[in-house]
Swiss-Prot record:
Organism of origin: Drosophila melanogaster (Fruit fly)
The protein's role, per its UniProt record: Possesses 3'-5' exoribonuclease activity. Required for 3'-end trimming of AGO1-bound miRNAs, in particular multiple-isoform miRNAs, which represents a critical step in miRNA maturation.
Keywords: Exonuclease, Hydrolase, Magnesium, Metal-binding, Nuclease, Phosphoprotein
The keyword Metal-binding is annotated on this UniProt entry: yes
Name the record gives this protein: Exonuclease mut-7 homolog
Cofactor: Mg(2+)
One GO molecular-function entry: nucleic acid binding
Disulfide bond keyword on record: no
S-S pairs: none
GO biological process per UniProt: miRNA processing; piRNA processing; pre-miRNA 3'-end processing; primary piRNA processing; secondary piRNA processing; transposable element silencing
3'-5' exonuclease domain mapped to chain residues: 410-602
Gene3D superfamilies for the chain: Ribonuclease H-like superfamily/Ribonuclease H
Subunit description: Interacts with AGO1; the interaction is not RNA dependent.
Gene field: Nbr
Length: 625
């Protein structure tokens, strides 16, 4: 096979020729001649005369000697002396530029260099004495810009903008910025466009996209924060790169040829990183999933595939699996993709069930599914399970915690009078136990559906979707009398997520600045694990148990929690009995675990106080509205 011309010659180690190596090295040596920064620094390419008069030249000569002696010690008298010299001149801003041009490091400004010191000092003088800038003409402003345009020092650039009134000559600077853009200085041009308020002069493919391509997302976001008119089209453009049949690089390859000196990161120009950027920008700027259809499609496909894997591992029961799939497979493309995925996974009976349920055209189905349906008919070929049939044997179901209260103690609250009675009873309690269930959203915020509050004798399942019956005043009363009541201890597990969803979804007006009446059992459990020899509980030592709620239940109560209904359609009304029992057990088990720890751990009160003291829901994400 012919070798490509750009491939390296493979020479075994030790057989290299010194002469050949020297020739290769010499051919790669380049001498770069730095052009005098004064050349073409003025308006219309005029040169800048940086010649110092005799007095200024003598001062600068002596000052350079002092700088070389004292600069590393950062002696404050240097800045004072230099400032006095500038103030003694009739045009301090112009003198500073001349001295800057005579600095040996003026073509390569560093933060601790003499050239940086000169401009930084004159800018600070201007800040203290604004009248110094009154005589600054456009040519002086242009010279100042040309001196610092490629420094990359944002603080210095912004100081020069104010001291030398660069915003007054923005129209003259725009062609200069485009020259920098042609030379591949995307970062510098973006910073200048933001500082000079010129973001509207560039389109999204000139700055925003190349910044993404070189992995400068924070700067791209800062640019979009100012270029408000580009946010929506840019997010739509990035979403268009998330094609289900073509790669990101393939879709934007024709665009990359227009950029010069662009060091592209091929990592970011791939599906997963680009999808994260689309999701981040859409969330930041408040765009709904209608703006990002490609991202929503691929994200939903992945979620549907995940649901089947969870069902296959018996982590979801059949009813939960099918009702959640019915909600999220909302269009023809998602449905056909899901049926094809099931067929490729060998789940032919389930694929045929959804083929029938979705009423999919046979030509859109995999060949094996179409063949089975045509031979046996949809009903016979599928042989699907009844939604009421569980896939776990009775011996395995005995492992799970069951409800120990009668049905009349499981109270569904979806009317105003029921809510009032519940509120009265809750105010009599010293400790209550909280949990919540929400409907998973693929791209947006999760929808709170049920709030569970358990007491010693009842479990209240509050319907958070009963908006007509339960109004804002009901939720405010619940927040004021229960959640913000310091005399009622609220016990939960991983309460950050629950409180965050509650804050966002309901007008409870929670006051979480001093959450000393909340106890997170997860924090309590982790504190117990810090004990040197652990803590013995009725069914094991805490150090041999995991950190999930089902692990606490097993160690304290001897039974696990059946999570097969956790991921189900909690927005469906009425709820299935299995959902009601699952939600009630989740809250009830908190009380049983709490009581067990109180009884079996002699030093539990000290651990509780320590756990409560560590609460910081505001920092962790439960934001106050």
């Amino acid at each position: 096979m012919a070798r490509k011309s750009h491939m390296y010659n493979a020479i075994p180690a030790g057989f290299e020729s010194d002469e050949e190596n020297m020739e290769n090295l010499m051919s790669n040596l380049k001498i770069k001649r730095l052009e005098d920064i004064t050349t073409g620094a003025g308006i219309d390419g005029c040169n800048f005369d940086a010649t110092l008069d005799a007095k200024a030249e003598e001062f600068f000569k002596l000052f350079r000697e002092k700088w070389n002696m004292y600069s590393k010690k950062k002696s404050p008298h240097l800045r004072q002396e230099f400032g006095r010299a500038l103030m003694g001149h009739q045009d301090p801003l112009l003198l500073a530029l001349k001295i800057f041009a005579n600095c040996p490091d003026s073509s390569n400004i560093k933060t601790k260099s003499l050239s940086h010191f000169v401009l930084d000092t004159v800018c600070k003088l201007h800040k203290d004495f604004p009248h110094l800038g009154e005589g600054c003409d456009p040519n002086t402003s242009m010279i100042a810009f040309n001196f610092v345009k490629t420094s990359g020092l944002l603080a210095l650039n912004n100081a020069v903008i104010h001291a030398y009134s660069l915003r007054q000559i923005r129209d003259l600077l725009l062609p200069k910025l485009r020259e920098l853009l042609d030379n591949g200085l995307y970062k510098e041009v973006t910073q200048w466009s933001i500082s000079l308020q010129l973001t509207h002069e560039f389109d999204m493919l000139e700055l925003a996209f190349p910044l993404i391509a070189i992995e400068k997302l924070p700067l791209a976001e800062e640019y979009l924060d100012h270029a408000t008119q580009q946010r929506l089209p840019f997010v739509k453009f990035l979403d268009s790169l998330l094609h289900k049949e073509k790669s990101v690089l393939e879709l934007c390859e024709h665009l990359l040829d227009r950029y010069k000196n662009l060091k592209i990161s091929h990592n970011v120009l791939s599906y997963r990183p680009m999808a994260k950027i689309v999701a981040r920008l859409a969330k930041k700027y408040g765009f709904d999933d209608a703006v990002t259809p490609n991202y929503k499609f691929t994200k939903t496909c992945s979620y549907l595939h995940y649901l089947y894997r969870e069902y296959e591992k018996t982590r979801m029961n059949l009813a939960s699996f099918r009702e959640v799939v019915s909600v999220h497979a909302f269009n023809h493309e998602l449905r056909t993709d899901f049926v094809k995925y099931l067929a490729s996974a060998g789940a032919h009976s389930e694929a045929i069930y959804w083929y029938t349920e979705f009423n999919i055209d046979p030509k859109d189905c995999p060949l094996e599914i179409e063949t089975q349906v045509s031979q046996n008919g949809a009903g016979k070929a599928s042989g699907w399970e009844s939604p009421g049939k569980e896939r776990c044997p009775s011996s395995r179901c005995d492992m799970y915690l069951t409800m120990d209260l009668p049905d009349e103690c499981l109270i569904i609250v979806n009317k105003a009078d029921e809510f009032d009675r519940m509120l009265y009873h809750l105010q009599q309690e010293c400790v209550i136990y909280l949990d919540s269930e929400w409907m998973q959203s693929v791209c947006g915020d999760n929808q709170l559906c049920v709030l569970q509050i358990a007491t010693g004798h009842n479990v209240y399942l509050i319907d958070c979707l009963a908006r007509e019956s339960l109004r804002s005043e009901h939720w405010r009363l619940l927040g004021a009398n229960i959640f913000n009541n310091v005399n009622i201890r609220k016990v939960g597990f991983s309460m950050v997520s629950d409180l965050s969803v509650l804050q966002r979804s309901l007008p409870l007006q929670l006051r979480l600045q001093m959450p000393h009446h909340y106890l997170d059992l997860r924090n309590l459990w982790l504190e117990l694990k810090k004990q040197r020899f652990g803590v013995e509980l009725p069914f094991g030592n805490v150090n041999r148990a995991g950190d999930a709620l089902t692990d606490l239940s097993l160690a304290c109560l001897g039974k696990k929690l059946n999570k097969s209904n956790q991921c189900s359609n909690w927005a469906n009304r009425p709820l299935r009995r299995e959902q009601i029992l699952y939600a009630a057990i989740d809250a009830r088990c908190l009380m049983l675990i709490y009581n067990t720890l109180i009884e079996r751990v002699s030093f539990i009160q000290a651990v509780i106080e320590k756990s409560i003291a560590s609460n910081n829901f505001l920092r962790r994400g439960a934001h106050v509205k």
